[in-house]
Structure formats: structure tokens, C-alpha cells
């Protein structure tokens, strides 16, 4: 079944951008697509991007999160609440987790920036965040573990990383996205005024550029929708390798090559000649070269020119090797 042409943007406009904030514009969109695309991207951005956070802590002399530390104003519960807010950026690609031992002494405040001097693979993005206040003679010894994760993980799920009874699991806020807002506005295309413009604003913690965050969210959505794009939808477990690299261009070409020629508005003569030769889809057609086509019964140069123009308009060409697109002829 042929799909009617959709009004869609040729590209995404980046209206504003720095390391933490980006404003993007998609236009024109069909009526109703603004909220469809905007809401889907917002939910993925807020819940599903990867980041780094503290998942366990150990404070010398403390057995559980409801205890207090001698000489420290805040109790352990409040210290944990503050540690959950510390934001990290990976600076050494090989480091996806790191455990550090921290000693705080001769200081009235323990800030997030004080963790930096103990780190090898990460950078603290909010160094001015105060973790706790100490008396002048107080000393605090703390071990923390930083790891990679997605979205939000509660303390109970981090319990598996506790190596001994005095290690305390904490909630981990991995998402690098601080806020996402979108709005849908009317947009005019020629004489029609009911098209839409989607304006998307993304605020990150600085560990990822807003443009990269948007790209990652789009890839996650496309990867999931790809499961519904095949003509074969079954109740069986998929055999697709979960680690297989996903290529948007390959997916687009794969779907294009599956298009049936009967839906391409060809002349009856050309269509009948191709049908007689069992050439039913664009994928079947592009595998032939022009010489082979002219050998088909009743196939002439006029039909060849018609097909040549068709493929040129779709950025396809004769004699194409389509094996990498893994098409299954049904």
C-alpha cells in the first residue's frame, strides 16, 4: 500500500546552543505531529539517557543511613541527599565506574568540588554544591563508588554493589537532562495555515551537549519503532542481535526497496513487462542493469527511460547490490 507524502522538515534548526542549553525547531509538521513527536522526545530525554552518578557510599564509623557522624552537622540521610545531586562527566573514556576514598579534615565545609582531587576518570560539574558542614576539629573518612547507568535507579537496586555490611546503597540519578520543554505553534506552508512548528528546549547538566542528547533520544525512539517497520510481525522471540549497530540510512533504504512497483504510478506497459519477469518491488528492479531489462519480452527504450527517471527521483540506480539491506522476498 502506497504511503501518501507527508509534510516534514528537511532538517532540524538549532536556534540556541551552549554546553547546557539548546533550543531546536522542527517545521513544517503535519497537524497533530507536533505533540506526537514533542511528547515522545521529551519522555525519552527525561527517562532514558545514560549518565554517571554515585551508587554506594561508606562512611567510617557509620553502619546505616540513619546514623550521625561525630563533628558533622548533617546526619547521614542529609549527606546522602546531597551526594545524589553531585553531577559527573566522564573525562577518560575507559572509565565507566570508579571507587575513591575521601578524607575531609581541617575544613568547615565539604563540597562536591573536594571530590575532584581524588578522581581519575571523571570531572565534577557542580563543584560548589555543599555536601555537609564540619566542626573545626572533625575528620570524616568516606568511600564512594561512581558508575554508569540510565535514568533513575532506587537504592534497593544498588544493593547488589554493596561489598560489605557497612556499605550503604543510595538512589542514583543518572539522567543528564535537567529539564525539557516543548511547545507547538501554527505554521504556514504556501496557502495552508494548519501545519505545525515544534519548538523543543533541552537543559542538561553539562555532561552531554543538548544536540547530542537530542540525537541519542531520537535513536532510542527509532530503534524501538523499527521493530514495527518490518512486514513480518510475529509473536515469536526476535532473532535480532541486540548488540547489532543500528543505521538509520540502512533502515530507510530497506523500507524503500520493499515498495511495490504497482504503487509507483508506472505505465501499464512497463508494469506488465516487469510483472511478467517477476519484478515486483524496487528492490527487485535495482538489481538489474539496463541491458538486462531490454531483454525482457516487449520491454522497450521508452519503458527504460520511464524507469530510469523513477529511480533517479528516488536516488536509486540500476545494478545496485542490495545484500546488505537483508531483504526477505516473500
Curated annotation (Swiss-Prot):
Role this protein plays:
DNA-dependent RNA polymerase catalyzes the transcription of DNA into RNA using the four ribonucleoside triphosphates as substrates.
The biological processes this protein is annotated with in GO are: DNA-templated transcription
Name the InterPro entries on file. DNA-dir_RNA_pol_insert (IPR011262), DNA-dir_RNA_pol_RpoA/D/Rpb3 (IPR011263), DNA-dir_RpoA (IPR011773), RBP11-like (IPR036603), RNAP_asu_C (IPR011260), RNApol_insert_sf (IPR036643)
The gene name reads: rpoA
From which source organism is this entry? Phocaeicola vulgatus (strain ATCC 8482 / DSM 1447 / JCM 5826 / CCUG 4940 / NBRC 14291 / NCTC 11154)
Write down the top EC class of this protein. transferase
Keywords carried by this UniProt record: DNA-directed RNA polymerase, Nucleotidyltransferase, Transcription, Transferase
Give the stretches traversing the membrane: none
Q: Which GO terms describe its molecular function?
A: DNA binding; DNA-directed RNA polymerase activity; protein dimerization activity
Q: Which domain of life is it from?
A: Bacteria
Name-wise, this protein is: DNA-directed RNA polymerase subunit alpha
Query: Catalyzes what?
Result: RNA(n) + a ribonucleoside 5'-triphosphate = RNA(n+1) + diphosphate
Disulfide feature: none
GO cellular component, alphabetical, reads: cytoplasm; DNA-directed RNA polymerase complex
Q: What HAMAP family does the record point to?
A: RNApol_bact_RpoA
Region entry Alpha C-terminal domain (alpha-CTD), spans: 253-330
- Name the family: Belongs to the RNA polymerase alpha chain family.
Amino acid at each position: 500500500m502506497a504511503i501518501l507524502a507527508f509534510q516534514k522538515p528537511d532538517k532540524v534548526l538549532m536556534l540556541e546552543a551552549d554546553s547546557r542549553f539548546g533550543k531546536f525547531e522542527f517545521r513544517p509538521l503535519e497537524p497533530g505531529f507536533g505533540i506526537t513527536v514533542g511528547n515522545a522526545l521529551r519522555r525519552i530525554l527525561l527517562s532514558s539517557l545514560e549518565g554517571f552518578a554515585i551508587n554506594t557510599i561508606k562512611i567510617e564509623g557509620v553502619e546505616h543511613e540513619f546514623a550521625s557522624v561525630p563533628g558533622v552537622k548533617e546526619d547521614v540521610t542529609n549527606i546522602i541527599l546531597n551526594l545524589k545531586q553531585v553531577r559527573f562527566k566522564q573525562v577518560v573514556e575507559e572509565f565507566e565506574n570508579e571507587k575513591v576514598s575521601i578524607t575531609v579534615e581541617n575544613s568547615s565545609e565539604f563540597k562536591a568540588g573536594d571530590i575532584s582531587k581524588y578522581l581519575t576518570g571523571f570531572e565534577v560539574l557542580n563543584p560548589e554544591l555543599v555536601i555537609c558542614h564540619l566542626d573545626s576539629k572533625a575528620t570524616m573518612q568516606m568511600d564512594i563508588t561512581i558508575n554508569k547507568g540510565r535514568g533513575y535507579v532506587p537504592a534497593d537496586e544498588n544493593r547488589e554493589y554493596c561489598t560489605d555490611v557497612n556499605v550503604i546503597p543510595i538512589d542514583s540519578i543518572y539522567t543528564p537532562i535537567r529539564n525539557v520543554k516543548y511547545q507547538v505553534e501554527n505554521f504556514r506552508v504556501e496557502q495552508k495555515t494548519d501545519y505545525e512548528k515544534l519548538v523543543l528546549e533541552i537543559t542538561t547538566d553539562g555532561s552531554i551537549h543538548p544536540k547530542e542528547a537530542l540525537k541519542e533520544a531520537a535513536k532510542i525512539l527509532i530503534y524501538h519503532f523499527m521493530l514495527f517497520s518490518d512486514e513480518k510481525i510475529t509473536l515469536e522471540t526476535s532473532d535480532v542481535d541486540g548488540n547489532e549497530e543500528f543505521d538509520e540510512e540502512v533502515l530507510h533504504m530497506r523500507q524503500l526497496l520493499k515498495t511495490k512497483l504497482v504503487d509507483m504510478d508506472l505505465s501499464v506497459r512497463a508494469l506488465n513487462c516487469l510483472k511478467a519477469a517477476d519484478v515486483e518491488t524496487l528492490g527487485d528492479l535495482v538489481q538489474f542493469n539496463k541491458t538486462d531489462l531490454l531483454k525482457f519480452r516487449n520491454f522497450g527504450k521508452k519503458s527504460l527511460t520511464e524507469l530510469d527517471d523513477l529511480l533517479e527521483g528516488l536516488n536509486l540506480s540500476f545494478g545496485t547490490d542490495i545484500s546488505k539491506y537483508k531483504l526477505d522476498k516473500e
